Amino acid sequence: MKDIPAEILMAPASAVGAADKNWTAVFADLVKARLTALVLATTLVGFYLGWRGAMDFALMFHMLAATALVASGAAALNQLLEREYDAKMRRTQDRPLPSGRLQPATVMLFGSACATVGLIYLALVVNLLTSIVGAVTLLAYLFIYTPLKRVTWLNTNIGAVPGALPALMGWTAARGDLGNGGWALFAIVAFWQIPHFMAIAWMYREEYARAGFKMLPVVDPAGRRTGKQSVSHTLALLAVSLAPFIFKLAGPVYLAGALVLGVGYLFCAVQFSRQLTLARARWLFLASILYLPLLLALMVWDKVK
């Protein structure tokens, strides 16, 4: 998953002055704690839906611990690569590197160690396939998505791939294969990200422009393509969200809830596309952060045994 602006979530760590931050807060900023938590949530749902029979809680724990290490390492290394650009944006200038609370060498060592240990952990304790998917996620996030942010507006669409792969990792950890259910979860998280990040990019387009990031709202100041991307991907999401029911992973309660949530999310995207204001971008963003956890909760609640 790509970074979520801290100041538009409740109780943001970055709202506190750098001088007042303790090392726990510094660590939380470095590993992008909220983003890592979301990664773990999608991974956990993938594992739960993929698992058959009595739950293996030990394996679940190992999967989550290893995934947390990989996600934390990816977050730290991403900040290392973007430290000069983070310093130019108000919402990121208080991160550990641009604020001077950590040195690049420290972050490099920490991030590399976490990512490497996490991938080895997955391979040895979970399974090799999950480790491979984790490695693809890490490399695509750091060396494809991250540099593309300064090259093309398509970075958001391309970045949705590593952002959605943790859901597939959960499935592979449970089943040991790349089955239809895993790809369905991947597609849901991938399509969900586009309107979510279009709303964020619209709200922060001036900061992105100042930092040199070519987000779609930066290169499309009128917002026509931004609105179309939001609506088209929300429509696609509404369709793919039916897949867990079609593949007999979730039941009719999930189906009904997915339709209601999807229509609500689509409504917010359409309203945003019709009038690209800050207020409607915020509504779309809020709809997105409600949609995904509620949809995942419905999957868990109405899993077909």
Segments from the language model and where they lie:
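Membrane-embedded alpha-helical segments that form the functional core of polytopic membrane enzymes
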Residues: A41-R83, R91, A115, I132-F143, ...
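Multi-pass membrane catalytic core of lipid/isoprenoid biosynthesis enzymes
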Residues: R83, R91-S131, P221-F245
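Cytosolic, membrane-interface loops and tails of multi-pass inner-membrane proteins
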Residues: P5-N22, L81-L102, M198-T226
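Transmembrane alpha-helical segments that form the membrane-embedded catalytic/substrate-channel core
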Residues: L69-A76, L139-P147, I188-R205, L238, ...
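Interfacial loop-to-transmembrane junctions
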Residues: R225, L266-L294
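Intramembrane alpha-helical segments
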Residues: P104-A174
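The first (N-terminal) embedded transmembrane alpha-helix
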Residues: K32-L49, V161
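Helix-coil boundary and interhelical linker segments in multi-pass alpha-helical membrane proteins
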Residues: Y48-A65, V117-I132, A167-A190, V240-V253, ...
